[in-house]
Amino acid sequence: RSLVGSEMCIRDRDDVQAYAAQDIKNAIAFVEEHTGQHWDWSHYFECAKRVNDTTRNRLAWLEMNSTPFPQFVGAPFSLYNDTNYMGNCGRSEKFPPIDRKIMRYAERGSRARRMMAKEYRHRAIVWGVQPQYCIDMLNWMVHCWGIVPLTDMLSLVNTRMIADTDTPENREQAFYDMAWLNENMIMRNRTHGGYKVLVDELWEFCETMHADMVIMWEHMSCKALTGMHGQFEEQARARGIHLVWVCHDLCDPRVYTRQAIRDQLNAYMRTVMREEPLDPSIEVLPDENAW
């Protein structure tokens, strides 16, 4: 099965794409009219080449993570993708050399079969709205419980190559490509688009990445996934996938302290999985400075 997920049905309709592309044209025309600046096609296609380079790297890292020895896991995968895909999106020339350096390290680790912990017990897909940047929970999961976070919902963005050569045909295609990238922006590509992209594709990624566990973040201030709670539970059970709900309120420790977030996983692993931590010394961590 390919790592490229099935695309959203409504976004494949020609009339939808034409409407979205026209919106991009209108936005560019508005900026040109009110600023006196003109769209630079040469610069656009330079950026498009870097966007494609980023997409190829992301697919290669996902392919690597589908093996028994994943190398690009946890928050580094998601935080780097967020920055590169959404914040940079091909504009900076500094990213491709960094990408190549990262790839060399990852390939070297894969050949050497390097592991982040002494034992990998479970392979997990991380789904939902995540707080891992502020508490580094994914790194903790690996070292405390041997749960390897292979990828996360916010990193599973565009997998298409866009037109990156300046031709009259590609200039027209570029409006559609920009529309597609906006349609498949981080968060929007999962929480907007219906049941298929939020629920069905999760199980496809579990199969592709050989995951036996899903860490389901439940952000208390965001109800995007709440309506699907029962569906997630029922379908995970039918597939034999362990689904762990972990509540949080992002960086706010007044609602859920960092240890309270970790304890939800601790309780699941001890009571449901009947497992002991790989490293009991980090099961409970001091969080006095969480504020």
Located regions from the model:
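Single conserved hydrophobic/aromatic residue that forms the stacking wall/gate
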Residues: 1-10
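Short, charged, surface-exposed secondary-structure boundary motifs
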Residues: 14-15, 158-165, 254-257
